[in-house]
Design a protein with these regions (language model features):
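A structural signal for conserved, well-ordered secondary-structure elements
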Residues: 1-629
Protein backbone atom coordinates (compact mmCIF):
# COMPACT_ATOMS: atom_id res chain seq x y z
CA UNK A 1 0.00 0.00 0.00
CA UNK A 2 3.05 2.28 -0.31
CA UNK A 3 5.48 3.31 -3.01
CA UNK A 4 8.96 4.67 -2.34
CA UNK A 5 10.41 6.85 -5.09
CA UNK A 6 13.90 8.38 -5.16
CA UNK A 7 14.54 10.91 -7.95
CA UNK A 8 18.10 12.28 -8.23
CA UNK A 9 18.31 15.86 -9.44
CA UNK A 10 14.71 16.81 -8.57
CA UNK A 11 14.72 19.82 -6.22
CA UNK A 12 11.04 20.79 -6.33
CA UNK A 13 9.17 18.46 -3.96
CA UNK A 14 5.87 20.09 -4.91
CA UNK A 15 5.98 18.73 -8.44
CA UNK A 16 7.05 15.17 -7.72
CA UNK A 17 3.55 13.73 -7.28
CA UNK A 18 2.39 15.50 -10.43
CA UNK A 19 5.41 14.20 -12.36
CA UNK A 20 4.68 10.66 -11.21
CA UNK A 21 1.32 10.84 -12.90
CA UNK A 22 -2.13 9.58 -11.99
CA UNK A 23 -2.83 6.11 -10.56
CA UNK A 24 -4.87 3.88 -12.81
CA UNK A 25 -3.74 5.64 -16.01
CA UNK A 26 -1.69 2.77 -17.51
CA UNK A 27 -2.70 1.27 -20.86
CA UNK A 28 -1.26 -1.41 -23.15
CA UNK A 29 -2.14 -0.70 -26.79
CA UNK A 30 -1.94 -2.36 -30.15
CA UNK A 31 0.11 -0.61 -32.83
CA UNK A 32 -3.07 1.09 -34.12
CA UNK A 33 -3.81 2.61 -30.69
CA UNK A 34 -6.49 0.13 -29.58
CA UNK A 35 -6.34 -0.53 -25.83
CA UNK A 36 -6.23 -4.27 -25.11
CA UNK A 37 -5.15 -4.23 -21.45
CA UNK A 38 -5.08 -1.75 -18.56
CA UNK A 39 -3.02 -1.36 -15.41
CA UNK A 40 -5.39 -3.32 -13.17
CA UNK A 41 -4.17 -6.48 -14.90
CA UNK A 42 -0.57 -5.82 -13.82
CA UNK A 43 0.54 -7.50 -10.57
CA UNK A 44 4.06 -6.09 -10.31
CA UNK A 45 6.97 -4.52 -12.18
CA UNK A 46 10.59 -4.54 -10.99
CA UNK A 47 13.87 -3.35 -12.49
CA UNK A 48 16.51 -6.05 -12.98
CA UNK A 49 19.90 -6.68 -14.56
CA UNK A 50 20.52 -9.59 -16.95
CA UNK A 51 23.11 -10.57 -19.54
CA UNK A 52 22.54 -11.36 -23.20
CA UNK A 53 23.97 -14.34 -25.10
CA UNK A 54 27.25 -12.48 -25.57
CA UNK A 55 27.65 -11.69 -21.86
CA UNK A 56 26.73 -8.02 -22.18
CA UNK A 57 24.84 -6.45 -19.28
CA UNK A 58 21.20 -5.50 -19.98
CA UNK A 59 18.81 -3.43 -17.89
CA UNK A 60 15.25 -4.73 -18.05
CA UNK A 61 11.86 -4.52 -16.35
CA UNK A 62 10.36 -7.79 -15.12
CA UNK A 63 6.60 -7.58 -15.64
CA UNK A 64 4.23 -9.85 -13.69
CA UNK A 65 0.56 -10.06 -14.70
CA UNK A 66 -2.61 -11.19 -12.96
CA UNK A 67 -4.33 -14.37 -14.13
CA UNK A 68 -6.72 -12.32 -16.26
CA UNK A 69 -3.85 -10.23 -17.61
CA UNK A 70 -1.78 -13.33 -18.43
CA UNK A 71 -4.63 -14.75 -20.50
CA UNK A 72 -5.22 -11.49 -22.40
CA UNK A 73 -1.50 -10.85 -22.90
CA UNK A 74 -0.94 -14.38 -24.16
CA UNK A 75 -3.68 -14.05 -26.79
CA UNK A 76 -2.52 -10.62 -28.00
CA UNK A 77 1.20 -11.45 -28.16
CA UNK A 78 0.47 -14.68 -30.04
CA UNK A 79 -1.25 -12.63 -32.75
CA UNK A 80 1.30 -9.78 -32.83
CA UNK A 81 4.76 -11.39 -32.96
CA UNK A 82 7.21 -8.91 -34.50
CA UNK A 83 4.91 -5.94 -33.86
CA UNK A 84 5.21 -3.13 -31.31
CA UNK A 85 2.81 -2.89 -28.35
CA UNK A 86 3.11 0.65 -26.89
CA UNK A 87 2.78 1.12 -23.12
CA UNK A 88 0.97 4.40 -22.43
CA UNK A 89 1.11 6.08 -19.04
CA UNK A 90 -0.76 9.26 -18.16
CA UNK A 91 -1.38 9.92 -21.86
CA UNK A 92 2.25 9.48 -22.95
CA UNK A 93 4.08 6.51 -24.46
CA UNK A 94 6.70 5.41 -21.91
CA UNK A 95 7.88 2.26 -23.69
CA UNK A 96 7.60 0.87 -27.21
CA UNK A 97 8.50 -2.83 -26.85
CA UNK A 98 8.38 -5.24 -29.77
CA UNK A 99 6.94 -8.74 -29.28
CA UNK A 100 9.69 -11.32 -29.87
CA UNK A 101 7.49 -14.35 -29.22
CA UNK A 102 4.14 -15.33 -27.73
CA UNK A 103 4.13 -14.68 -23.96
CA UNK A 104 1.70 -17.01 -22.22
CA UNK A 105 3.26 -17.60 -18.79
CA UNK A 106 2.09 -14.40 -17.12
CA UNK A 107 5.57 -12.84 -16.95
CA UNK A 108 7.31 -10.65 -19.50
CA UNK A 109 10.60 -8.83 -19.82
CA UNK A 110 10.87 -5.31 -21.22
CA UNK A 111 14.38 -4.65 -22.51
CA UNK A 112 16.04 -1.64 -24.12
CA UNK A 113 16.80 0.56 -21.10
CA UNK A 114 20.27 2.10 -21.22
CA UNK A 115 20.79 2.34 -17.43
CA UNK A 116 19.49 0.64 -14.30
CA UNK A 117 18.00 3.98 -13.18
CA UNK A 118 16.04 4.15 -16.43
CA UNK A 119 14.68 0.65 -15.78
CA UNK A 120 13.74 1.67 -12.23
CA UNK A 121 11.86 4.72 -13.52
CA UNK A 122 9.91 2.63 -16.04
CA UNK A 123 9.07 0.00 -13.40
CA UNK A 124 7.89 2.71 -10.98
CA UNK A 125 5.67 4.30 -13.64
CA UNK A 126 4.11 0.92 -14.44
CA UNK A 127 3.46 0.16 -10.75
CA UNK A 128 1.92 3.56 -10.05
CA UNK A 129 -0.09 3.52 -13.26
CA UNK A 130 -1.56 0.15 -12.30
CA UNK A 131 -2.93 1.39 -8.95
CA UNK A 132 -6.66 1.85 -8.56
CA UNK A 133 -6.30 4.42 -5.77
CA UNK A 134 -5.13 7.96 -5.11
CA UNK A 135 -1.60 8.76 -4.00
CA UNK A 136 -1.05 10.69 -0.78
CA UNK A 137 2.28 11.84 0.66
CA UNK A 138 3.50 9.95 3.74
CA UNK A 139 7.13 10.99 3.72
CA UNK A 140 9.23 13.24 1.53
CA UNK A 141 12.80 14.41 1.73
CA UNK A 142 14.59 16.85 -0.56
CA UNK A 143 18.34 17.23 -0.14
CA UNK A 144 20.16 20.11 -1.80
CA UNK A 145 22.92 19.12 -4.21
CA UNK A 146 25.51 21.05 -2.20
CA UNK A 147 24.66 19.24 1.05
CA UNK A 148 24.52 15.82 -0.61
CA UNK A 149 27.91 16.13 -2.30
CA UNK A 150 29.47 17.49 0.90
CA UNK A 151 28.05 14.62 2.95
CA UNK A 152 29.26 11.95 0.53
CA UNK A 153 32.75 13.41 0.10
CA UNK A 154 33.30 13.99 3.83
CA UNK A 155 32.14 10.47 4.72
CA UNK A 156 34.38 8.88 2.09
CA UNK A 157 37.29 11.01 3.30
CA UNK A 158 36.61 9.78 6.85
CA UNK A 159 36.65 6.18 5.63
CA UNK A 160 39.93 6.62 3.75
CA UNK A 161 41.76 8.40 6.59
CA UNK A 162 40.41 5.99 9.21
CA UNK A 163 41.46 3.02 7.08
CA UNK A 164 45.04 4.30 6.77
CA UNK A 165 45.28 5.00 10.52
CA UNK A 166 43.98 1.51 11.36
CA UNK A 167 46.49 -0.08 8.95
CA UNK A 168 49.39 1.82 10.52
CA UNK A 169 48.17 0.86 14.01
CA UNK A 170 48.03 -2.83 13.07
CA UNK A 171 51.54 -2.78 11.59
CA UNK A 172 53.00 -1.03 14.66
CA UNK A 173 51.33 -3.39 17.14
CA UNK A 174 51.57 -6.73 15.29
CA UNK A 175 54.62 -6.39 12.95
CA UNK A 176 54.49 -8.95 10.10
CA UNK A 177 50.97 -10.19 10.95
CA UNK A 178 49.97 -6.51 11.02
CA UNK A 179 51.23 -6.10 7.45
CA UNK A 180 49.17 -9.15 6.47
CA UNK A 181 46.14 -7.62 8.17
CA UNK A 182 46.69 -4.30 6.37
CA UNK A 183 46.85 -6.04 2.99
CA UNK A 184 43.78 -8.12 3.83
CA UNK A 185 41.98 -4.96 4.90
CA UNK A 186 42.76 -3.32 1.56
CA UNK A 187 41.44 -6.41 -0.26
CA UNK A 188 38.39 -6.42 2.02
CA UNK A 189 37.61 -2.78 1.16
CA UNK A 190 37.96 -3.52 -2.57
CA UNK A 191 35.60 -6.52 -2.22
CA UNK A 192 32.98 -4.39 -0.43
CA UNK A 193 33.10 -1.75 -3.18
CA UNK A 194 32.93 -4.44 -5.89
CA UNK A 195 29.94 -6.11 -4.19
CA UNK A 196 28.07 -2.81 -3.95
CA UNK A 197 28.75 -2.20 -7.64
CA UNK A 198 27.84 -5.70 -8.85
CA UNK A 199 24.54 -5.81 -6.93
CA UNK A 200 23.88 -2.13 -7.74
CA UNK A 201 23.15 -1.26 -4.11
CA UNK A 202 22.38 2.44 -3.73
CA UNK A 203 24.94 3.99 -1.38
CA UNK A 204 23.21 6.22 1.17
CA UNK A 205 24.89 8.13 4.00
CA UNK A 206 23.89 5.49 6.60
CA UNK A 207 25.21 2.94 4.12
CA UNK A 208 28.59 4.67 4.10
CA UNK A 209 28.47 4.67 7.91
CA UNK A 210 27.84 0.91 7.78
CA UNK A 211 30.91 0.41 5.59
CA UNK A 212 33.10 2.50 7.88
CA UNK A 213 31.87 0.60 10.94
CA UNK A 214 32.38 -2.78 9.25
CA UNK A 215 35.97 -1.80 8.36
CA UNK A 216 36.62 -1.22 12.04
CA UNK A 217 34.98 -4.53 12.95
CA UNK A 218 36.87 -6.40 10.21
CA UNK A 219 40.07 -5.83 12.18
CA UNK A 220 38.64 -7.72 15.16
CA UNK A 221 38.98 -11.17 13.62
CA UNK A 222 42.63 -10.49 12.77
CA UNK A 223 43.31 -9.27 16.31
CA UNK A 224 41.81 -12.47 17.77
CA UNK A 225 43.91 -14.65 15.43
CA UNK A 226 47.17 -12.79 16.08
CA UNK A 227 46.65 -12.93 19.86
CA UNK A 228 46.18 -16.70 19.61
CA UNK A 229 49.32 -17.09 17.47
CA UNK A 230 51.38 -15.16 20.03
CA UNK A 231 50.03 -17.34 22.84
CA UNK A 232 50.96 -20.49 20.93
CA UNK A 233 54.50 -19.20 20.30
CA UNK A 234 54.82 -18.33 24.01
CA UNK A 235 53.83 -21.91 24.90
CA UNK A 236 56.81 -23.24 22.92
CA UNK A 237 55.19 -24.09 19.58
CA UNK A 238 57.04 -23.50 16.31
CA UNK A 239 55.86 -20.55 14.19
CA UNK A 240 54.12 -22.71 11.57
CA UNK A 241 52.38 -24.79 14.27
CA UNK A 242 51.43 -21.61 16.13
CA UNK A 243 49.82 -20.21 12.98
CA UNK A 244 47.81 -23.40 12.38
CA UNK A 245 46.67 -23.59 16.01
CA UNK A 246 46.00 -19.84 16.17
CA UNK A 247 43.58 -19.89 13.25
CA UNK A 248 41.91 -23.04 14.58
CA UNK A 249 41.42 -21.74 18.13
CA UNK A 250 40.19 -18.34 16.93
CA UNK A 251 37.55 -19.86 14.66
CA UNK A 252 34.76 -20.35 17.22
CA UNK A 253 35.04 -16.84 18.68
CA UNK A 254 35.09 -15.26 15.20
CA UNK A 255 32.07 -17.22 13.96
CA UNK A 256 30.00 -16.73 17.12
CA UNK A 257 30.77 -13.02 17.36
CA UNK A 258 30.04 -12.29 13.70
CA UNK A 259 26.87 -14.37 13.59
CA UNK A 260 25.38 -12.48 16.53
CA UNK A 261 26.22 -9.16 14.82
CA UNK A 262 24.70 -10.55 11.65
CA UNK A 263 21.47 -11.17 13.57
CA UNK A 264 21.26 -7.43 14.30
CA UNK A 265 21.84 -6.61 10.62
CA UNK A 266 19.11 -9.03 9.50
CA UNK A 267 16.62 -7.55 11.98
CA UNK A 268 17.46 -4.08 10.65
CA UNK A 269 16.80 -5.26 7.11
CA UNK A 270 13.42 -6.61 8.13
CA UNK A 271 12.21 -3.73 10.29
CA UNK A 272 14.15 -0.68 9.15
CA UNK A 273 13.07 2.01 6.70
CA UNK A 274 14.89 2.78 3.45
CA UNK A 275 17.91 4.58 4.88
CA UNK A 276 18.31 2.12 7.77
CA UNK A 277 18.06 -0.78 5.33
CA UNK A 278 20.95 0.77 3.41
CA UNK A 279 22.96 0.67 6.62
CA UNK A 280 21.91 -2.95 7.25
CA UNK A 281 22.83 -4.11 3.73
CA UNK A 282 26.34 -2.67 3.90
CA UNK A 283 26.85 -3.93 7.46
CA UNK A 284 25.77 -7.45 6.46
CA UNK A 285 28.04 -7.41 3.40
CA UNK A 286 30.87 -6.15 5.60
CA UNK A 287 30.40 -8.89 8.21
CA UNK A 288 30.40 -11.70 5.63
CA UNK A 289 33.42 -10.34 3.76
CA UNK A 290 35.33 -9.65 6.99
CA UNK A 291 35.05 -13.31 7.98
CA UNK A 292 36.23 -14.35 4.51
CA UNK A 293 39.24 -12.01 4.46
CA UNK A 294 40.29 -12.89 8.02
CA UNK A 295 39.95 -16.66 7.72
CA UNK A 296 41.07 -17.04 4.09
CA UNK A 297 42.94 -13.98 2.79
CA UNK A 298 44.90 -13.18 5.96
CA UNK A 299 45.81 -16.88 6.35
CA UNK A 300 47.07 -17.03 2.76
CA UNK A 301 49.15 -13.83 3.11
CA UNK A 302 50.59 -14.90 6.48
CA UNK A 303 51.60 -18.32 5.16
CA UNK A 304 53.13 -16.63 2.10
CA UNK A 305 55.30 -14.47 4.36
CA UNK A 306 56.40 -17.61 6.22
CA UNK A 307 57.37 -19.50 3.05
CA UNK A 308 59.19 -16.39 1.77
CA UNK A 309 61.59 -16.76 4.70
CA UNK A 310 60.01 -14.84 7.58
CA UNK A 311 60.14 -17.80 9.96
CA UNK A 312 61.71 -16.26 13.04
CA UNK A 313 59.30 -15.81 15.93
CA UNK A 314 60.52 -12.21 16.35
CA UNK A 315 58.47 -11.32 13.26
CA UNK A 316 55.27 -12.53 14.95
CA UNK A 317 55.72 -11.67 18.60
CA UNK A 318 55.33 -13.65 21.78
CA UNK A 319 52.52 -13.23 24.29
CA UNK A 320 53.86 -11.94 27.59
CA UNK A 321 52.90 -13.68 30.80
CA UNK A 322 50.58 -11.23 32.53
CA UNK A 323 49.66 -11.17 36.17
CA UNK A 324 45.98 -12.06 36.49
CA UNK A 325 43.89 -8.99 37.24
CA UNK A 326 41.18 -9.56 39.86
CA UNK A 327 38.29 -7.92 38.00
CA UNK A 328 35.63 -9.85 39.92
CA UNK A 329 36.78 -8.44 43.24
CA UNK A 330 35.46 -5.05 42.06
CA UNK A 331 32.23 -6.41 40.59
CA UNK A 332 29.89 -4.58 42.96
CA UNK A 333 31.75 -1.31 42.32
CA UNK A 334 31.23 -1.82 38.58
CA UNK A 335 27.54 -2.59 39.15
CA UNK A 336 27.14 0.58 41.26
CA UNK A 337 28.79 2.78 38.60
CA UNK A 338 26.48 1.42 35.90
CA UNK A 339 23.36 1.88 38.05
CA UNK A 340 24.38 5.48 38.81
CA UNK A 341 24.90 6.34 35.12
CA UNK A 342 21.60 4.76 34.06
CA UNK A 343 19.77 6.47 36.95
CA UNK A 344 21.17 9.82 35.76
CA UNK A 345 19.60 9.15 32.38
CA UNK A 346 16.18 8.41 33.82
CA UNK A 347 16.38 11.45 36.09
CA UNK A 348 17.29 13.60 33.08
CA UNK A 349 14.34 12.25 31.10
CA UNK A 350 12.07 12.95 34.06
CA UNK A 351 13.32 16.54 34.34
CA UNK A 352 12.70 17.12 30.63
CA UNK A 353 9.20 15.67 30.94
CA UNK A 354 8.41 17.81 33.99
CA UNK A 355 9.52 20.96 32.15
CA UNK A 356 7.00 20.33 29.36
CA UNK A 357 9.43 18.79 26.87
CA UNK A 358 9.61 15.25 25.54
CA UNK A 359 11.72 12.94 27.70
CA UNK A 360 13.87 12.34 24.61
CA UNK A 361 14.52 14.75 21.76
CA UNK A 362 12.37 12.90 19.24
CA UNK A 363 13.13 13.74 15.63
CA UNK A 364 10.63 13.83 12.79
CA UNK A 365 11.01 10.10 12.22
CA UNK A 366 9.46 9.44 15.64
CA UNK A 367 7.10 12.43 15.99
CA UNK A 368 5.96 13.39 12.51
CA UNK A 369 6.17 16.86 11.01
CA UNK A 370 8.39 18.81 8.63
CA UNK A 371 12.05 19.67 9.17
CA UNK A 372 13.61 22.45 7.10
CA UNK A 373 17.38 22.93 7.11
CA UNK A 374 18.94 25.93 5.37
CA UNK A 375 22.35 27.57 5.20
CA UNK A 376 21.87 31.22 6.23
CA UNK A 377 25.44 32.16 5.32
CA UNK A 378 26.27 33.73 8.68
CA UNK A 379 26.16 32.98 12.38
CA UNK A 380 22.89 33.56 14.26
CA UNK A 381 22.58 33.59 18.03
CA UNK A 382 19.69 31.80 19.73
CA UNK A 383 18.12 35.20 20.40
CA UNK A 384 18.47 36.17 16.72
CA UNK A 385 16.78 32.94 15.68
CA UNK A 386 13.89 33.49 18.09
CA UNK A 387 13.46 37.18 17.21
CA UNK A 388 14.15 37.16 13.46
CA UNK A 389 13.72 33.72 11.90
CA UNK A 390 10.95 32.01 13.89
CA UNK A 391 8.44 34.90 13.37
CA UNK A 392 8.95 34.62 9.59
CA UNK A 393 8.39 30.86 9.70
CA UNK A 394 5.32 31.36 11.92
CA UNK A 395 3.92 33.87 9.43
CA UNK A 396 4.15 31.33 6.61
CA UNK A 397 3.07 28.20 8.51
CA UNK A 398 0.75 29.56 11.20
CA UNK A 399 2.42 27.10 13.59
CA UNK A 400 2.82 28.35 17.17
CA UNK A 401 5.03 25.43 18.28
CA UNK A 402 8.16 25.92 16.18
CA UNK A 403 11.55 24.52 17.19
CA UNK A 404 14.80 25.83 15.72
CA UNK A 405 18.32 24.56 16.33
CA UNK A 406 21.73 25.64 15.10
CA UNK A 407 23.80 22.97 13.38
CA UNK A 408 27.13 22.96 15.20
CA UNK A 409 30.19 24.36 13.41
CA UNK A 410 28.12 25.50 10.42
CA UNK A 411 25.88 28.42 9.49
CA UNK A 412 22.95 26.04 9.00
CA UNK A 413 19.73 26.20 11.02
CA UNK A 414 17.15 23.40 11.31
CA UNK A 415 13.51 24.41 11.77
CA UNK A 416 10.91 21.86 12.92
CA UNK A 417 7.21 22.54 12.37
CA UNK A 418 3.95 20.69 11.98
CA UNK A 419 3.61 18.74 8.75
CA UNK A 420 3.60 21.24 5.89
CA UNK A 421 1.82 20.79 2.58
CA UNK A 422 3.68 21.07 -0.71
CA UNK A 423 2.38 24.60 -1.19
CA UNK A 424 3.47 25.66 2.30
CA UNK A 425 6.94 24.24 1.73
CA UNK A 426 7.14 26.26 -1.48
CA UNK A 427 6.06 29.42 0.34
CA UNK A 428 8.59 28.85 3.14
CA UNK A 429 11.33 28.18 0.61
CA UNK A 430 10.61 31.48 -1.16
CA UNK A 431 10.25 33.42 2.10
CA UNK A 432 13.62 32.26 3.43
CA UNK A 433 15.28 33.15 0.14
CA UNK A 434 13.66 36.62 0.04
CA UNK A 435 14.00 37.53 3.73
CA UNK A 436 17.46 36.13 4.52
CA UNK A 437 19.08 35.76 1.08
CA UNK A 438 19.32 32.00 1.59
CA UNK A 439 20.72 30.02 -1.35
CA UNK A 440 17.82 27.75 -2.33
CA UNK A 441 20.22 24.94 -3.30
CA UNK A 442 21.13 24.59 0.40
CA UNK A 443 17.52 24.24 1.62
CA UNK A 444 16.46 20.70 2.48
CA UNK A 445 13.00 19.51 3.52
CA UNK A 446 11.99 16.32 5.27
CA UNK A 447 8.37 15.47 5.99
CA UNK A 448 7.16 12.46 7.98
CA UNK A 449 3.48 11.69 8.45
CA UNK A 450 2.10 10.55 11.81
CA UNK A 451 1.52 7.13 10.22
CA UNK A 452 5.21 6.71 9.44
CA UNK A 453 6.45 8.11 12.77
CA UNK A 454 4.18 5.78 14.76
CA UNK A 455 5.45 2.79 12.83
CA UNK A 456 9.06 3.83 13.37
CA UNK A 457 8.57 3.98 17.15
CA UNK A 458 7.01 0.52 17.09
CA UNK A 459 9.75 -0.82 14.80
CA UNK A 460 12.47 0.51 17.11
CA UNK A 461 11.13 -1.41 20.10
CA UNK A 462 10.33 -4.47 18.00
CA UNK A 463 13.81 -4.53 16.44
CA UNK A 464 15.59 -4.43 19.80
CA UNK A 465 13.33 -7.10 21.32
CA UNK A 466 13.53 -9.49 18.35
CA UNK A 467 17.30 -9.18 17.94
CA UNK A 468 17.83 -9.64 21.68
CA UNK A 469 15.70 -12.80 21.77
CA UNK A 470 17.49 -14.23 18.72
CA UNK A 471 20.88 -13.54 20.27
CA UNK A 472 19.84 -15.12 23.58
CA UNK A 473 18.72 -18.27 21.78
CA UNK A 474 21.93 -18.44 19.74
CA UNK A 475 24.25 -17.93 22.73
CA UNK A 476 22.28 -20.47 24.78
CA UNK A 477 22.58 -22.99 21.93
CA UNK A 478 26.31 -22.41 21.40
CA UNK A 479 27.42 -22.30 25.06
CA UNK A 480 24.98 -24.94 26.41
CA UNK A 481 24.25 -22.76 29.46
CA UNK A 482 21.52 -20.13 29.59
CA UNK A 483 23.51 -18.21 32.20
CA UNK A 484 25.99 -17.23 29.49
CA UNK A 485 23.13 -15.97 27.36
CA UNK A 486 21.30 -14.25 30.21
CA UNK A 487 24.39 -12.37 31.42
CA UNK A 488 25.21 -11.29 27.84
CA UNK A 489 21.65 -10.01 27.32
CA UNK A 490 21.63 -8.10 30.62
CA UNK A 491 24.93 -6.50 29.57
CA UNK A 492 23.29 -5.55 26.26
CA UNK A 493 20.33 -3.98 28.04
CA UNK A 494 22.88 -2.11 30.17
CA UNK A 495 24.53 -0.76 26.99
CA UNK A 496 21.20 0.29 25.49
CA UNK A 497 20.22 2.15 28.67
CA UNK A 498 23.60 3.91 28.91
CA UNK A 499 23.37 5.07 25.29
CA UNK A 500 19.78 6.15 25.96
CA UNK A 501 21.24 8.23 28.80
CA UNK A 502 23.59 9.89 26.30
CA UNK A 503 20.64 10.66 24.01
CA UNK A 504 18.65 12.07 26.94
CA UNK A 505 21.31 14.22 28.61
CA UNK A 506 22.88 15.55 25.40
CA UNK A 507 19.48 15.99 23.70
CA UNK A 508 20.66 14.18 20.58
CA UNK A 509 17.84 13.81 18.08
CA UNK A 510 16.16 10.40 18.29
CA UNK A 511 15.44 9.74 14.64
CA UNK A 512 15.78 7.22 11.87
CA UNK A 513 19.38 6.26 12.65
CA UNK A 514 18.53 5.68 16.34
CA UNK A 515 17.46 2.11 15.54
CA UNK A 516 20.62 1.49 13.52
CA UNK A 517 22.76 2.94 16.31
CA UNK A 518 21.16 0.79 19.01
CA UNK A 519 21.34 -2.46 17.06
CA UNK A 520 24.91 -1.77 15.99
CA UNK A 521 25.89 -1.27 19.62
CA UNK A 522 24.07 -4.47 20.57
CA UNK A 523 25.88 -6.43 17.85
CA UNK A 524 29.25 -4.87 18.65
CA UNK A 525 28.93 -5.40 22.41
CA UNK A 526 27.81 -9.01 22.18
CA UNK A 527 30.69 -9.74 19.80
CA UNK A 528 33.14 -8.48 22.43
CA UNK A 529 31.40 -10.44 25.19
CA UNK A 530 31.38 -13.68 23.21
CA UNK A 531 35.15 -13.56 22.69
CA UNK A 532 35.58 -13.47 26.49
CA UNK A 533 32.95 -16.17 27.06
CA UNK A 534 34.67 -18.34 24.44
CA UNK A 535 37.89 -18.10 26.48
CA UNK A 536 36.00 -18.90 29.71
CA UNK A 537 34.50 -21.97 28.03
CA UNK A 538 37.98 -23.10 26.94
CA UNK A 539 39.52 -22.53 30.38
CA UNK A 540 36.62 -24.29 32.13
CA UNK A 541 37.26 -27.36 29.98
CA UNK A 542 40.78 -27.50 31.43
CA UNK A 543 39.36 -27.76 34.95
CA UNK A 544 38.59 -31.35 35.85
CA UNK A 545 36.42 -32.57 38.69
CA UNK A 546 34.27 -30.52 41.03
CA UNK A 547 34.61 -26.75 40.71
CA UNK A 548 34.55 -24.34 43.64
CA UNK A 549 33.68 -20.65 43.70
CA UNK A 550 37.39 -19.89 43.88
CA UNK A 551 37.97 -22.00 40.76
CA UNK A 552 35.26 -20.10 38.88
CA UNK A 553 36.60 -16.73 39.98
CA UNK A 554 40.12 -17.72 38.95
CA UNK A 555 38.90 -18.88 35.51
CA UNK A 556 36.88 -15.70 34.97
CA UNK A 557 39.72 -13.37 35.99
CA UNK A 558 42.28 -15.29 33.93
CA UNK A 559 40.02 -15.26 30.86
CA UNK A 560 39.44 -11.51 31.19
CA UNK A 561 43.17 -10.88 31.55
CA UNK A 562 44.04 -13.10 28.58
CA UNK A 563 41.58 -11.29 26.29
CA UNK A 564 42.20 -7.78 27.65
CA UNK A 565 44.71 -6.65 25.01
CA UNK A 566 42.44 -7.97 22.27
CA UNK A 567 39.46 -6.06 23.73
CA UNK A 568 41.48 -2.84 23.95
CA UNK A 569 43.01 -3.10 20.45
CA UNK A 570 39.69 -3.95 18.80
CA UNK A 571 37.97 -1.08 20.59
CA UNK A 572 40.70 1.33 19.49
CA UNK A 573 40.52 0.36 15.80
CA UNK A 574 36.72 0.47 15.67
CA UNK A 575 36.65 3.72 17.62
CA UNK A 576 39.13 5.27 15.15
CA UNK A 577 36.79 4.62 12.22
CA UNK A 578 33.72 6.05 13.93
CA UNK A 579 35.67 8.98 15.38
CA UNK A 580 36.85 9.97 11.89
CA UNK A 581 33.23 9.81 10.79
CA UNK A 582 32.30 12.11 13.67
CA UNK A 583 35.22 14.45 13.00
CA UNK A 584 34.72 14.83 9.24
CA UNK A 585 31.05 13.97 8.67
CA UNK A 586 28.16 16.38 8.19
CA UNK A 587 25.80 17.19 11.08
CA UNK A 588 23.39 14.29 10.47
CA UNK A 589 26.27 11.80 10.39
CA UNK A 590 27.81 13.29 13.54
CA UNK A 591 24.48 12.80 15.33
CA UNK A 592 24.80 9.12 14.43
CA UNK A 593 28.52 8.80 15.23
CA UNK A 594 28.49 10.50 18.66
CA UNK A 595 26.18 8.04 20.49
CA UNK A 596 27.85 5.22 18.55
CA UNK A 597 31.23 6.19 20.04
CA UNK A 598 29.67 6.32 23.49
CA UNK A 599 28.14 2.91 22.87
CA UNK A 600 31.46 1.40 21.83
CA UNK A 601 33.17 2.65 24.98
CA UNK A 602 30.26 1.34 27.02
CA UNK A 603 30.28 -1.97 25.11
CA UNK A 604 33.96 -2.53 25.88
CA UNK A 605 33.33 -1.64 29.54
CA UNK A 606 30.32 -3.93 29.90
CA UNK A 607 32.00 -6.93 28.28
CA UNK A 608 34.97 -6.61 30.66
CA UNK A 609 33.35 -5.28 33.84
CA UNK A 610 29.69 -6.37 33.69
CA UNK A 611 28.97 -9.48 31.57
CA UNK A 612 31.55 -11.85 33.06
CA UNK A 613 30.82 -10.62 36.58
CA UNK A 614 27.09 -11.26 36.03
CA UNK A 615 27.87 -14.75 34.72
CA UNK A 616 29.84 -15.50 37.90
CA UNK A 617 27.03 -14.23 40.16
CA UNK A 618 24.47 -16.36 38.27
CA UNK A 619 26.76 -19.38 38.28
CA UNK A 620 27.11 -19.37 42.07
CA UNK A 621 23.56 -18.32 42.96
CA UNK A 622 21.17 -19.51 40.21
CA UNK A 623 20.32 -22.78 38.49
CA UNK A 624 20.13 -26.42 39.44
CA UNK A 625 23.91 -26.88 39.23
CA UNK A 626 24.80 -23.67 41.07
CA UNK A 627 28.08 -23.76 42.96
CA UNK A 628 27.60 -23.30 46.69
CA UNK A 629 31.14 -23.88 47.94
Amino acid sequence: DRIAVEIPGVTDASKILEELGNPGSLEFQLSDGTVFMTGDQVADAQAATTTDQYGNKQYVVQLTLTDEGAKTFGEVTSENVGKALPIVYDGEVISYPTVQEAITGGTAQISGQSTFEEAQTLATQIRIGSLSLQLSELESSVVGAQLGSQAISSSLKAAAIGLVIVMVFMIIVYAVPGVAAALALAIYTALVIATLYLFEITLTLPGIAGIILSIGMAVDANVIIFARIREEIASGKSVITAMKNGFHKAMSAILDGNITTLIAAIVLMGLGSGTVKGFAYTLMIGIILSMFTALVVTRWILYSFYWLGMRDEKFYGRAKERKTINFLQKRYVFFAISIAVIAAGFIGMGVHKASGQNSLNYGLDFMGGTSTTADFGKEYTIEDIENDIIPVVKEVTGDSNIQANKVEETTQITIKTRTLSKEERDDLNNKLADSFDVDESTITFQSISSTISGEMRADAVKAVIISTICMLIYIWFRFKDIRFGASAIIALIHDVLVVLTVYALMRISVGNTFIACMLTIIGYSVNDTIVIFDRIRENLALKHGKQTREDLMEVANRSLTQTLSRSINTSITTFIMVFMLFLLGVASIREFALPLMAGMICGAYSSICIATELWYVMKVHLGKNKITE
